[in-house]
Amino acid sequence: MKKIWVIFTVLSILAATHISPVQAISESQSEAIQELLDETSKKSGETGLSLSIVDGDEVIYFSSGYANRKTEEPVTKDTLFELASVSKAFTGLGILLLEEQGFLSMTDPIQTYLPWLSFEYEGSPIDMQSVTLNNFLHHTSGLTNELHFQDIPQGNSQDMLLKTVEGLKTSQLQFLPSQQYQYGTVNYDVLGLVIEVVTNKSYERFMSDEVFQPLDLNDTYLYQADAQETGQMAKGYRPSFFMTIPYGAPDFAGNKPAGYIISNSKDMARWMKIQMGQIEDIPDNFKRIIEKSHKGNESVSADDGLYYGAGWLVNSDASYIEHDGVNPNFSTQVVLFPEDLRAVSLLTNSTNVNNIYIIDSVQNILEGKPIEPYQRSGMHLTDIIFSSATIIFTVLALLFFMISLRRERNNNQNRISKKRKVVIGGLLALTIIIAILSLIYPMFIGYDWQTLLVWQPYSLVTALLSLTAFCASFTWYIWKYPKIKPYKKSN
């Protein structure tokens, strides 16, 4: 009887150990991560954040901020966000699946599927037989954000993907195909259209039937309307004058394969575990193509030590895999450490968060290292700079305007000297030049005005306007400045 009791006790302990594994993340680490997110939400203009961590067999979720500030709906692991360019890994998997199934080869020329597509380089047509599907997969086609980002049309009709790629016909390439890597989001729109041509299905239907369902990604959506129906879709915000404001960005349905898949932290955790080979209940062919998707294109130079795979940036031995994404009112970051079976995903509903800082800080917390002081995102800093400039130039413009107006009413002005006429002429010319430069400013950053108004903070526009107003006001101030009479010595 005693032996039986000992055996029962041992088995009970083993069973309990199996059911309740030791927590990989300590309570103090959890508190530090939550504090990090709360601080980030507050300093980034009340941004909503949803974080998922895979650490071995454990999945931990953290959240902070609001999915909708007006209704005070908090962010949870179920909250849906636009994945932005993290969407590319899904599209990359889809195109590799078609290759695995024998429908295409990534070495096929693009004209095999889109015979009407043609490009030019330095004004001359290029041999389209030399442009393969791999060029689009690895961003070596010559289509880049610098030249082709603003070509993405707005709209949500069923043919927007076709319209988006048709807009690339006869595009001027930034470099000859296969010569170098340079990121261009439209490359994955081309792949999305190839999926439609090969399967005779919409991109959305193919991805839902052949990728999301087999992988059991049940909270991942391709249509904004479907996501809204769940009641879990986060409201997007954009930076504006030291805060974030609600922003309903235009529809870019033609850019869906590159940047507009929608998901939540629960599905992203499963997605990361699938990427690291921790999920067994998926078709075997996915295991093969996922491994293939992590192979970076080493035929061109690395970008900061990373090569581009199929929707992923990877180092040479695939021990570090990541991708980020930014839409007008959402941003994301996913980082995988396959050798450590650790991965982190961050979803946010504004562009004010420095996502890679959060990911690095979480990694430091998990490794027991100190974290760096809070670092703002580039977009947040842009808004701070231009908002500050707007205030300064507006105040100065009003000040000089009021002084000049008072002098105008008092007729407090003497005859204008030739010297002052030269100064006024120079200031007037400067005002005109600044006004012209403000009008063409988007060209300097690779945008047009329509694109700039969608993607950049409104404070950028007001800063340019207030600078022009300041120059005009200061010119009038000099015009109205009273002439100083020369001092005459008394006898």
Model segments located where?
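Short active-site loop at a secondary-structure junction
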Residues: 43-50, 71-135, 175-185, 256, ...
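C-terminal segment of classical bacterial N-terminal signal peptides
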Residues: 14-21
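Alpha-helical scaffold elements that line and support the substrate/ligand-binding pocket
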Residues: 51-58, 82-105, 109, 136, ...
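Catalytic loop of the DD-peptidase/beta-lactamase superfamily, centered on the K-T-G motif
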Residues: 24-58, 62, 249-491
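Catalytic-site signature segments of enzymes, centered on catalytic residues
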Residues: 145-234, 243-269
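Active-site helix/loop module of the DD-peptidase/beta-lactamase fold
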Residues: 27-30, 82-85, 98-144, 197-234
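Hydrophobic helical h-region of N-terminal Sec-dependent signal peptides
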Residues: 9-13
